[in-house]
C-alpha cells in the first residue's frame, strides 16, 4: 500500500465528505467511486459507515469528530498533495495554523471556501444534517503541481 504522504504529484481526485452521522446515502457511494482517495472529516459515528465507505474502493483517510467514539481515529491528519500542506480535522481551529496551507474541516455542517491570512479553509458541508439553509453536500478536491480545485456537490 502506498504511503499517502508520498504519492506522485499527478492530478489526484479526492472525494471529501463530513458529518455523515450514521448515514451514508447510496448516491454518496456512487459519486465516490471515481475518486483516487476519500477523506472523511469526522462525525462518522458508526464503524459500519466507515466500512461501507471503504468498500467503495479508494483509500480512505478519516479524522475523529466530536460525535465519534473510536479513539483509534486521529484528531488531525497532515498530508502533502500537489506540493501543498493540508491539514484534516473535524473542528476548525480558532486561528490559522502556521504549518498548513489548507485546513479541511467539518463540524459546522455549512460549506466553506475561505482564505484567512495565508491559509485556505475548506468544508464540504454535511451529508445528512445540513445547517443554515445549506443543502446536504460533499466536495471534490483536485490537487496537482501546487494548485487546488475545490468543487462543492449538492446532494439535493
Where are these regions (language model features)?
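Active-site glycine-centered loops adjacent to acidic/histidine catalytic or metal-binding residues
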Residues: 19, 43, 65, 106-107, ...
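Metallo-beta-lactamase
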Residues: 54, 72-90
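N-terminal active-site segment of His-dependent metallophosphoesterases
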Residues: 1-60, 68-75, 134-137, 145
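Conserved beta-sheet core of the metallophosphoesterase superfamily
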Residues: 61, 82-151
